Amino acid sequence: MKHYRKIIHIDMDAFYASIEQRDNKKLKGRPVIVGGNPQSRGVVATCSYEARKFGIHSAMPSAVAYNRCPYAVFVRPRFDVYKSVSEKIRDIFYRYTDLVEPLSLDEAYLDVTKNKKNIDSSIEIAKQIKKDIFREVGLTSSAGVSYNKFLAKIASDLRKPNGLTVITEENAQDFLDKLPVNKFFGVGKVTSNTLKNLGIKTGYDLRCLNLFELENIFKKRGYELYKFARGIDDRPVEPNRVRKSVGAETTLSHNLDIDEEETRNILDELCEEVCHRLKNSEKFGKTLTLKIKYEDFTKITRSLSLEHYIDEYNDIRSGVDNLLRNVEVNGKQIRLLGVTISNLSDKKETYKDITLFEYMDSIQM
C-alpha cells in the first residue's frame, strides 16, 4: 500500500542552551546548563551538547548536574527570548505550508504533501528549512522526514545535532524491527519497563505480539503500540491542536513516607518541570492536581481550582503544598508522585491576570 503523505518533524538542537551560546560568545563550546541554581532546589530545563557528555539531561536536579560538571555555566531561562526566536522559526515554516503543528517552542510537525513552493521532494524542503533557520536565526536544527508523524518524530532524533534522517516506506519495517522499544516515541519509562520485563527489547519483539495480547497488557494503549510496531500512524498534522494539560510524574527509586524531606524535594523537581513545560507550551493553567500511588498500588488524586491562571513555579509549588495538606497520613509509603496543571489557556488571553500570591494578598487585606 503506497502512502502519499509527506511529513517533516523539525526539532531544534538544545534550543535554549544554543540561544544562550549564540547570544554570549564566551559560552560557545562550553558546557551550558539552562535551569535553576545548583545551590537551590532547581532542575535542569535543558543543556548544551558539551554538558550532555557528562550525563546531564533535562529534569535532572541542578545540584546533581553541578556535581557531574562543576565548571558548567548555569544560566537562568529567558523565556521571552526563546519565544521570540520560536516565532521567527515558525514564520519560516509557514513559507512552505500552513499545515504546521507546533509541539512546543522548539519542535513542530509539517505536512508538505502540498506546499507553497511546489517542491515535490520533502527531503529538499527539509534541507531548505534547515538552511533558512541557520541563516536567519543562527541555530541548527534536526529534521526527520517520513510518511507519518510517528516515523518523522523518531527520525529527527537519530542524527542530532544538525541531522537529517529519512525513513521511507521501503525501509520502515526493517528499521522499526531493529529499533529498541525505548526509542519508540511515546514509550515512556513505565511502558518500557513493562516491555522489558516481558522480554520485549526491539520493535520486532513488539511486532510478534498480536493485538489481543497487547490490549490485554496495555488496554487502549495496546492498539497504538500494535500500529506503531508496523509503522502505521494515521494521525493528521493538526495546526489548531489544543493541549488539555501539562504534567510530570516519577516512579520513586525507593518508597517514601509522605512527610519525608525527600518527598518534598521530589515535588520541588516536579513543579519545576511542570513550570518549564507550561512556559514551553506558552500556556497558563487554572487547575492543579496532585497524584499519589502507594506501595500497595492504590492511587489517590487531589485537585485545586484557582481563581486565576498561573505559570510561575512559586504559584504551582504553593498550590501543591495546599493539596498535600489534604492528603491523609495513612501509614502507607509512596511509590509514585505526579503533578498536573489543566484548564489551560493561551498566555495572550491571560497575560494581565494576577498571580496566586497576589490574589492571596488581596483577599487578606
Curated annotation (Swiss-Prot):
<protein>
    <recommendedName>
        <fullName>DNA polymerase IV</fullName>
        <ecNumber>2.7.7.7</ecNumber>
    </recommendedName>
</protein>
<dbReference type="InterPro" id="IPR043128">
    <property type="entry name" value="Rev_trsase/Diguanyl_cyclase"/>
</dbReference>
<keyword id="KW-0460">Magnesium</keyword>
<keyword id="KW-0515">Mutator protein</keyword>
<feature type="site" description="Substrate discrimination">
    <location>
        <position position="16"/>
    </location>
</feature>
<dbReference type="Pfam" id="PF00817">
    <property type="entry name" value="IMS"/>
</dbReference>
<keyword id="KW-0963">Cytoplasm</keyword>
<keyword id="KW-0227">DNA damage</keyword>
<dbReference type="InterPro" id="IPR053848">
    <property type="entry name" value="IMS_HHH_1"/>
</dbReference>
<comment type="function">
    <text>Poorly processive, error-prone DNA polymerase involved in untargeted mutagenesis. Copies undamaged DNA at stalled replication forks, which arise in vivo from mismatched or misaligned primer ends. These misaligned primers can be extended by PolIV. Exhibits no 3'-5' exonuclease (proofreading) activity. May be involved in translesional synthesis, in conjunction with the beta clamp from PolIII.</text>
</comment>
<dbReference type="InterPro" id="IPR043502">
    <property type="entry name" value="DNA/RNA_pol_sf"/>
</dbReference>
<dbReference type="InterPro" id="IPR001126">
    <property type="entry name" value="UmuC"/>
</dbReference>
<keyword id="KW-0239">DNA-directed DNA polymerase</keyword>
<dbReference type="Pfam" id="PF11799">
    <property type="entry name" value="IMS_C"/>
</dbReference>
<keyword id="KW-0479">Metal-binding</keyword>
<dbReference type="GO" id="GO:0009432">
    <property type="term" value="P:SOS response"/>
</dbReference>
<dbReference type="InterPro" id="IPR022880">
    <property type="entry name" value="DNApol_IV"/>
</dbReference>
<feature type="domain" description="UmuC">
    <location>
        <begin position="7"/>
        <end position="188"/>
    </location>
</feature>
<dbReference type="GO" id="GO:0000287">
    <property type="term" value="F:magnesium ion binding"/>
</dbReference>
<feature type="binding site">
    <location>
        <position position="106"/>
    </location>
    <ligand>
        <name>Mg(2+)</name>
    </ligand>
</feature>
<dbReference type="GO" id="GO:0006261">
    <property type="term" value="P:DNA-templated DNA replication"/>
</dbReference>
<comment type="subunit">
    <text>Monomer.</text>
</comment>
<keyword id="KW-0548">Nucleotidyltransferase</keyword>
<dbReference type="InterPro" id="IPR036775">
    <property type="entry name" value="DNA_pol_Y-fam_lit_finger_sf"/>
</dbReference>
<keyword id="KW-0234">DNA repair</keyword>
<keyword id="KW-0235">DNA replication</keyword>
<keyword id="KW-0808">Transferase</keyword>
<comment type="similarity">
    <text>Belongs to the DNA polymerase type-Y family.</text>
</comment>
<feature type="active site">
    <location>
        <position position="107"/>
    </location>
</feature>
<feature type="binding site">
    <location>
        <position position="11"/>
    </location>
    <ligand>
        <name>Mg(2+)</name>
    </ligand>
</feature>
<dbReference type="InterPro" id="IPR017961">
    <property type="entry name" value="DNA_pol_Y-fam_little_finger"/>
</dbReference>
<dbReference type="GO" id="GO:0003684">
    <property type="term" value="F:damaged DNA binding"/>
</dbReference>
<keyword id="KW-0238">DNA-binding</keyword>
<dbReference type="GO" id="GO:0003887">
    <property type="term" value="F:DNA-directed DNA polymerase activity"/>
</dbReference>
<dbReference type="Pfam" id="PF21999">
    <property type="entry name" value="IMS_HHH_1"/>
</dbReference>
<dbReference type="InterPro" id="IPR050116">
    <property type="entry name" value="DNA_polymerase-Y"/>
</dbReference>
<dbReference type="GO" id="GO:0042276">
    <property type="term" value="P:error-prone translesion synthesis"/>
</dbReference>
<dbReference type="GO" id="GO:0005829">
    <property type="term" value="C:cytosol"/>
</dbReference>
